[in-house]
Amino acid sequence: MYDFVIIGGGIIGMSTAMQLIDVYPDARIALLEKESGPACHQTGHNSGVIHAGVYYTPGSLKAQFCLAGNRATKAFCDQNGIRYDNCGKMLVATSELEMERMRALWERTAANGIEREWLNAEELREREPNITGLGGIFVPSSGIVSYREVTAAMAKIFQARGGEIIYNAEVSGLSEHKNGVVIRTRQGGEYEASTLISCSGLMADRLVKMLGLEPGFIICPFRGEYFRLAPEHNQIVNHLIYPIPDPAMPFLGVHLTRMIDGSVTVGPNAVLAFKREGYRKRDFSFSDTLEILGSSGIRRVLQNHLRSGLGEMKNSLCKSGYLRLVQKYCPRLSLSDLQPWPAGVRAQAVSPDGKLIDDFLFVTTPRTIHTCNAPSPAATSAIPIGAHIVSKVQTLLASQSNPGRTLRAARSVDALHAAFNQ
């Protein structure tokens, strides 16, 4: 019997595993991942941005964890020889309406404690000669990294400390009892743990349902489609270039991202995926689609954002529409500059009343902890999220009448926080 089993080999699961074994070095800990390696889904299909925390509600978990995670991610990369580029982010306003929205973002960045610089049109042009706008906000702490590399390094540390990673282990059933949890896999394996931690991303709600519980949310998969610019445009921007988002819309808009390999990507958009892991336009699952359309919460989301949703679908099918979005601030790009690039799928939790759950969300039972909503900036925030989960583990252990083996904490969660806040 394991002391802890973690489900999910993305960056949240690996960060949690790495920090849990740091706090409890004598614990028997296993991580189950349904794929043949780590970071195969959201972690390995995002833009790689180290976010600063510009957009998030002051005081929210997203705001707190993103600010701490920005520092922690860079510190982890420095300690483990992982390359990153602290290139900074430029938020660009292209209309008077966007200038008003930019002023609101300026106030929010101040509330979140983020260093930033206000630029007029001339100053913007000096920094970014190929970008057109009325003004901008420069955020120097934003950067770029390969989260696949970060996750692989976390896995290596976890294993070096005695943790066990079991790949090709897709969880198909869970049974919670007073002394622990039984985990069954589609491959025929069966594992038992005193405490279970689920970091299951796109499958988060289904893991809660396996316990016979009503999760109170449903995961809605949104595909984010990207293009890569032709190589001759690898130097077209000096920073990450973001539009000013519409506060009525749930996503940030199409942006230019300088990748860690030197290439530049355009995207992502946000299109409803008709399969939980539907990375291609043609991917379709009848059961997943039935589940999506059968959810009153998702139907309300689609109704509330019908016009923008149809626009996203149109631009997904017609590259010229996608191009127009980026030409608003980078007019020199043409259709021939947009080359295919792999898409990602966001796991967005939706409430029964049709709200996109805005903050990170965790659900606990006497023997389990579930990470239920961890969209962007979860990759940036992975280290503080992992520490937060370890803190929840300690609370859970203290409340259990029969916690199993007595485990000695080698360090406190406060020490984890202190380490990545230095």
UniProtKB/Swiss-Prot annotation:
Gene field: ygaF
Name of this protein: L-2-hydroxyglutarate dehydrogenase
Example GO biological process: L-lysine catabolic process
Presence of the UniProt keyword Repressor in the record: no
Primary localization: membrane
SUPFAM superfamilies: FAD/NAD(P)-binding domain (SSF51905)
Keyword line: Cell inner membrane, Cell membrane, Electron transport, FAD, Flavoprotein, Membrane, Oxidoreductase, Transport
E.C. number(s) listed in UniProt: 1.1.5.13
The protein's role, per its UniProt record: Catalyzes the dehydrogenation of L-2-hydroxyglutarate (L2HG) to alpha-ketoglutarate and couples to the respiratory chain by feeding electrons from the reaction into the membrane quinone pool. Functions in a L-lysine degradation pathway that proceeds via cadaverine, glutarate and L-2-hydroxyglutarate. Also displays some oxidase activity in vitro on L-2-hydroxyglutarate with O2 as the electron acceptor, but this activity is most likely not physiological.
Highest taxon of source: Bacteria
Cofactor(s) listed in the protein's UniProt record: FAD
Pathway: Amino-acid degradation
InterPro entries registered for this protein in UniProt: FAD-dep_OxRdtase, FAD/NAD-bd_sf, L2HG_DH_bact
A GO term, aspect molecular function: 2-hydroxyglutarate dehydrogenase activity
One GO cellular component term noted in the UniProt record for this chain: plasma membrane
The keyword Membrane is assigned to this record: yes
Family assignment from sequence similarity: Belongs to the L2HGDH family.
Record Gene3D superfamilies: D-Amino Acid Oxidase, subunit A, domain 2, FAD/NAD(P)-binding domain
HAMAP family membership: L_hydroxyglutarate_dehydrogenase
Known catalytic reactions: (S)-2-hydroxyglutarate + a quinone = a quinol + 2-oxoglutarate
Record's subcellular location: Cell inner membrane
